[in-house]
Amino acid sequence: MLENKDNLKDLFSPIKVVLVGTTHPGNIGASARAMKNMGLLNLALVTPKEFPSDAATFRSKAAKDVLENAQVFEDLKDAVADCELVIGTSARDRKVPWPVLNPKESAEEVAKSALHHQIAIVFGREDRGLSNEELGLCNLHVHIPSDPEYSS
């Protein structure tokens, strides 16, 4: 177990959370808040519908610094250009030609790589996730099981 928050920040500093095509700015703020709670501070946004936004700031609560330091990109390729390991996420179980991991396996890959590499964890749009083309920019794909009736 980590002894203090500085160790957590050091451990997670190479990890970037990338949100693609976010349609509701409140989700950006909520993501920033969740990130900060977990010790993740690097946020990248790819073509968000609305950012910056009062709704994002309101939902972020004490994670305004994560929003203020967020980088905005026009495409996913640019957002992950500095990363050696790119993990695409999906609630759908897809047939893709690269490794599909469960969340535990994905966490193990991140832990192994974080010591020496920049890492991106990519989340897709609220309504349809990542496109196959966007998943093609990822080294790994993590399938996050969810309720089949509401897999947003």
What are these regions (language model features)?
Residues 1-152:
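Post-transcriptional modification and biogenesis factors for structured RNAs
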